[in-house]
A protein has these predicted regions:
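Alpha-helical structural segments
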Residues: 3, 7, 11, 22-30, ...
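Short linear motifs at protein or domain termini
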Residues: 1-14, 19, 128-142
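Hydrophobic, amphipathic alpha-helical faces that serve as interaction scaffolds
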Residues: 1-16, 46-86
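C-terminal all-alpha effector/ligand-binding and dimerization domain
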Residues: 25, 29-33, 77-142
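Amphipathic alpha-helical linker/stalk segments
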Residues: 14, 32-35
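Hydrophobic packing residues in well-ordered alpha-helices of helical domains and bundles
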Residues: 21-24, 41-45, 61, 65, ...
């Protein structure tokens, strides 16, 4: 994912319409709703990331990414599910995804790639913390 997603983001940021970015921003804001758990948003979260990359992704890219996304699903649900009781987690979830859309809006390939790379790194670190010893007291990565 670290090699493929940033590379596709570099191309996609120039192809996404303003209307699609507006729609994705509204979706990102919805990820922060206090009443939505990770299980509630998982499918729309997957679709959000797919939509960010879709304009520049080949069918082969989507096939590979879908396999990788589904393979990581259990860890995402465990890691972020354990954070759901923390009201600040919902705000972070929203912020991280709004930041992704903002990076794509700049239409700068390096900015978009860096934002995706940072997003993946945060996710990896949070998942490792959530799955490690003492996971009941997970502190999310900022």
């Amino acid at each position: 994912r670290r090699r493929l997603e940033p590379e596709i983001a570099q191309r996609s940021c120039r192809l996404l319409s303003d209307a699609e970015l507006d729609r994705l921003e509204r979706e990102a804001v919805g990820f922060g709703a206090q009443d939505r758990t990770m299980n509630d948003i998982y499918d729309s979260h997957h679709e959000f990331h797919h939509a960010l990359l879709a304009p520049a992704a080949t069918s082969w890219d989507i096939r590979i990414l879908s396999t990788l996304w589904r393979a990581s699903e259990r860890y995402i649900r465990i890691g972020w599910g354990s954070l759901d009781p923390d009201p600040q987690e919902h705000a972070r979830r929203e912020q991280y995804h709004v930041e992704l859309v903002a990076a794509f809006r700049q239409r700068d390939p390096e900015v978009a790639a860096d934002a995706v790379q940072q997003h993946l790194s945060r996710n990896e670190q949070t998942a490792l913390l959530a799955l490690g010893p003492g996971r009941s007291r997970v502190a999310p990565v900022s």
